């Protein structure tokens, strides 16, 4: 039995409060790339300065991001990170943050299968949007550790696809889409506890949910709220 709300995961709280005693307070710079601005964290240590892109820095805290559509390149990157973190510590949880409109079913299933196979629990956290394959991966997190931020949106639907060519080619592609539809619906029923018949009806069209609705549906277990902040006598913010 889980409460409707929970504070942010421990790694996020540690980063927010600056509690990593191994490093001095990092300086943050931004580097403009062709697609987006990727911040670089410059950390001071006894051995001098070291620079990390923000995602590599968060990977050290066992935090992985899925912040784009799902394709083979994205799947390869996330699978590699999950396997690396398992090799580093097979008992410590991994956090997978999801803000994704979905994408390739086969690429998404590669991520999903790896999530189920690695030894550590993979906690999933939705921020922004988890739609289509993004919502499926959100539901595939470790039981009790599937979460969403309060303003997130979650959407499930059936696989989409198209085909052209001779009639037999179209028939082959149609069978493949129906196979993926059946597989995804079966797994969604397993992860949510909903009857398969309800999953089939709800995924027939785009089915949007708020975090609270997704929790009631069984897609997630907790809705995250902002940690309570207290101000110390020295005006330093600390987490309660």
Swiss-Prot record:
<dbReference type="InterPro" id="IPR023562">
    <property type="entry name" value="ClpP/TepA"/>
</dbReference>
<dbReference type="InterPro" id="IPR001907">
    <property type="entry name" value="ClpP"/>
</dbReference>
<feature type="active site">
    <location>
        <position position="157"/>
    </location>
</feature>
<feature type="active site" description="Nucleophile">
    <location>
        <position position="132"/>
    </location>
</feature>
<dbReference type="Pfam" id="PF00574">
    <property type="entry name" value="CLP_protease"/>
</dbReference>
<dbReference type="GO" id="GO:0005737">
    <property type="term" value="C:cytoplasm"/>
</dbReference>
<comment type="similarity">
    <text>Belongs to the peptidase S14 family.</text>
</comment>
<dbReference type="InterPro" id="IPR018215">
    <property type="entry name" value="ClpP_Ser_AS"/>
</dbReference>
<comment type="function">
    <text>Cleaves peptides in various proteins in a process that requires ATP hydrolysis. Has a chymotrypsin-like activity. Plays a major role in the degradation of misfolded proteins.</text>
</comment>
<dbReference type="GO" id="GO:0004252">
    <property type="term" value="F:serine-type endopeptidase activity"/>
</dbReference>
<dbReference type="GO" id="GO:0009368">
    <property type="term" value="C:endopeptidase Clp complex"/>
</dbReference>
<protein>
    <recommendedName>
        <fullName>ATP-dependent Clp protease proteolytic subunit 2</fullName>
        <ecNumber>3.4.21.92</ecNumber>
    </recommendedName>
</protein>
<keyword id="KW-0720">Serine protease</keyword>
<dbReference type="InterPro" id="IPR029045">
    <property type="entry name" value="ClpP/crotonase-like_dom_sf"/>
</dbReference>
<dbReference type="GO" id="GO:0004176">
    <property type="term" value="F:ATP-dependent peptidase activity"/>
</dbReference>
<comment type="subunit">
    <text>Fourteen ClpP subunits assemble into 2 heptameric rings which stack back to back to give a disk-like structure with a central cavity, resembling the structure of eukaryotic proteasomes.</text>
</comment>
<keyword id="KW-0645">Protease</keyword>
<dbReference type="GO" id="GO:0006515">
    <property type="term" value="P:protein quality control for misfolded or incompletely synthesized proteins"/>
</dbReference>
<keyword id="KW-0963">Cytoplasm</keyword>
<dbReference type="GO" id="GO:0051117">
    <property type="term" value="F:ATPase binding"/>
</dbReference>
<dbReference type="InterPro" id="IPR033135">
    <property type="entry name" value="ClpP_His_AS"/>
</dbReference>
<keyword id="KW-0378">Hydrolase</keyword>
